[in-house]
Amino acid sequence: MEPFDIVINNAGVQNEEDIDVNLKGTIGITEKYGIRPGIRSVLMIGSASGHNGSEFPEYVASKGGVLSYTKNVALRIANYGATCNSLDFGGVLTDLNLPVIEDKALWNQIMEQTPLKRWMTVEEAADWAYFITVTNHFCTGQNILIDGLEAGNAHFVWPEEPTV
């Protein structure tokens, strides 16, 4: 397999496998493919919840671990001239979030507490990923919170039992 210029860790789940997938999976992929000469950029997809703690405990812990690991990787690959950052999104309109989006009562509650009254589109997320991995050559070791100011209302806590 040809070496990669860019590694993007985008795996994420919200279930009993949070730590294994979100944190250990990110570490495993990065250690295998991202820590080497020739790497240009490693991108972690974190979560606003890693900053504000407003989701399920295992998920928050796994994404908080990704934030710390981002800085560790940035220090280790800087001597290759490479960058490592995390993009820590709030709500994103994906199929994985359909149960939340389709639960009108929950969706309305979330939108009441979301300053921009919308979630990020997949295209907006891709634009950020492109910028931080391709255009950027200097910013490194940063956990970049892109949440439409959801963190400004960090008192919102997800219900214990998600509505499906």
Question: Residue locations for each model-derived region?
Answer:
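Short, small/polar-rich loop/turn modules that mediate ligand/substrate recognition or access, typified
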Residues: A78, T83, C139-Q142
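Catalytic loop of short-chain dehydrogenase/reductase
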Residues: S41-N79, G91-V92
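Conserved catalytic-site loops of classical short-chain dehydrogenases/reductases
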Residues: D5-I6, R40-I45, A82-N85
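Conserved SDR Rossmann-fold cofactor-binding beta-strand/turn motif
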Residues: T83-L93, L145-D147
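C-terminal substrate-recognition "lid" of short-chain dehydrogenase/reductases
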Residues: R118-I146, A151
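Conserved NAD(P)H cofactor-binding loop of Rossmann-fold oxidoreductase domains
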Residues: N10-N15, L149
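A glycine/serine/threonine-rich, flexible loop-to-helix segment
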Residues: N79, F89-Q113, H155-V164
